[in-house]
Every structure is written in C-alpha cells, then in structure tokens.
Amino acid sequence: MSRRAVTAVFLLISAAIALSSCALQTEMSPEIFLERLAEADKTLSVDFDGRYYSGDRCYCFVSDGGGTEYVLSMQTCADGSVQSVSLASTAVDRTAAFISLAGKVTSVYSPQEDIKAIVSALFLDGKVGERCEYYNTRRYEYSSASSENGLYFSIDDLRLGERSTPALTLGDLSGYLNRTKPSAQ
C-alpha cells in the first residue's frame, strides 16, 4: 500500500471514530452517564438504587471519597437521552471538591470540550459568594452559582432542544440532601 493510501485509511478511521463518539454522546441515557461517571472517578459512590424520576428528570445522589454528598439531576429528551446535567451541594466548605467533580461531570458529558477553560471561567477564584456565572460553546451552555447555602453547576446540550429549566435552586439543596422529593417549581 502506498503512503497516500495508508494516510487516507487512517483519516477515514479517525473520522469514523469521531462521528461514532458524537453519536454515542447524544444518545446517553441517565444510567449510562452515571456508569461512565463512576468509571471516571473510582472514589465516587453513586447511589444507583436511590435514584428516582420526576417527570423528565432523573435524580441521583453521589458522594466523594471525603464523604461529601452531591445531588445530580439529569433532564432527558423525549427519546430518553440526557439533555442537561446539574450538580449541587450544600457543602460550601468543600468548594475545591465540588469544582473537581464539576470537571469530571464535564469530561463525561462533553468530553470534547476544554474542561480547564470551562471550570476556570465558571468558578473564577474558587471562592464562595452570591453569584452566577455562564460559559457558552457552540454546543453547550455551562452555568454555575454559589451562595452561602450551596454550590450549583449545570451543562445544557443546546443541540438536543431548548435550554432546560433549572433543575433545582440553591434553596432546595437541603431538602434534596435529606432525601426528600423536589419541591414544586
């Protein structure tokens, strides 16, 4: 085989792999997302049995190696694919751990994105204060919020539909972490 033929075959295989990973990304169910997140960070404990659905949202509780508990909320499209992912915690004293987990959520949900740029734009100095930050790419909208009540992070896949409604508010966090159903919004 000539060098050109080998190069052409390599490019075709690379393009096929890239296209298949994009196709897998848009067809990720909440269960697959949670499995991939657990695989990405072996220190996370994902409560698969405790997850529940409310309308088009799947809620799941996750705790890290340090014992901090988080709430993950995944909004799904009509076909069951994850359209948005939200992460929340009331542990404002564990901001660094929250930022690290937000980076892992980003790497699983939108692996082709510049995770370092997103996390640094959203969390700036890593300090907690009453503020919201947004970061947009061609395909995703990222947002974060922090207050004395908790920390919040979300990713919306803009190609899968309109921007989702907020999964939860910072005021809802203590209820979520006490294993109650979400309040009416």
Region spans (language model):
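Bacterial signal peptide processing site
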Residues: 23-25
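Long, charged/polar, surface-exposed segments that mediate recognition or autoinhibition
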Residues: 76-127
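Short glycine-rich, low-complexity/disordered patches
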Residues: 42-57, 110-138
